Amino acid sequence: MSDTAILTLRTMLANLDDAKKYQSLRDVMSTLPAPDLAAVFEDLPPEKLPVLFRLCPKDLAAEIFAELTPETQQDLIDGLTDKELKAVVDDLFVDDATDLVEEMPANVVKRILAQADPATRRMINELLKYPEDSAGGVMTTELMELRPDWTVSQAMAAIRKNGFDKETINNCYVTDRDRTLIGVVSLRALVLSKDPDNELIRDMMDDNVVSVSTTTDQEDVSQMFEKYGYLAIPVVDNEKRLVGIVTIDDAISIMQDEASEDIAKMNAMGPSDKPYFKQSMWELYKNRAPWLLFLMISSTFSSMVIRGYEDALAAVTVLTAYIPMLTDAGGNAGSQSTSTIIRGMAVGDIEPHDLPKILWREFRIAILWGGTLALCNFAKLIFLDGIAPPVAAVVCLTLICTVILSQLIGGLLPVVAEKLNFDPAVMASPLITTIVDTTTLLVYFNIARVLLRI
């Protein structure tokens, strides 16, 4: 149903200037959830954004706005009146409003804050004090607080009165008079209470609360969601006072951003939080060029090695034919090892102190892999390629050594990077491949000199 409605809406928007069937548009839009409507907005030219936004169901307008990319949000803001902008900002959850302020240029931020009501403006300024990549920077202050001496009936009355403006009421947080976090109670427990008029919150709350500090790194926060399976995690200050919560939707966004950043770094690109088609040619060039330039310069070491062994290649020219196979095998082996280690470090399975165990494990795997590849390759060289056994031995011994060295290097570099406070993702495929290429050539030519006496 959703896909059909989206297609219908796109068709109607293509002929909007001619049809002017606004009521029909409203009817179609009322059947779609906010994320689907936001996807339609992303495809519209800037001049049509305000028209469509004014037709949105009022209860979905802020939610749709929060789903848009910063570029589309700015285009939409430029087309809204101050009154319309105020309605949107006031309906946004405070963490979404803070994200909006962080993403917009100064002139747009000034306009947003001017339209926000004083309470919202105060909460936004409070959240902006925290680092962007910390729990304080991604939390919301719109949460449900209860007191330990309340009865369940009093708590339910408070939720009915104030819960509509809270980001979530699935879990309610119990605080004392100083706002110190002392417990958590679920809405389920409150609803299912058998004696709501007499049962106290302190008697049913869970006082073993998992919380994070305002300075906790956002990646660590997202890992806690994965570990505990929570829908929200409370955030406390240095004095253990409750200041906000991080919700699961923000945790998912953090995971997506961190994964995108790691993928970009693992492929020698600068990370970008913009969709592909929202990036200009210059941005794409800027994200890719520095690493490609560095890798091109670093690959000259391989050229220097080859020039240094020109005599060996001239004596046994067939050695040249197997250089690509050896360097590719080494690069692939190193990349597999690196990717496995980086992934393990990202999810907390691997710590820097595990380095000796990592190297021993990778060495044993490399022996098995290298031996298997060498046996298969030796049979191919002798029976299919008709290569002399001494040359085949050189190639296969190099293959074993290359796989071992590559996997050891691939296991070593991410851990070393972590210890030196570098991002382990930087030590990924392109850089590993460059290092392994040079190492492979040195091993290859030296084995050839020894076995072939050249």
Predicted regions and their residues:
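Extended alpha-helical regions
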Residues: 154-157, 435, 439
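Generic detector of well-ordered alpha-helical packing
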Residues: 238, 250-251, 329, 424, ...
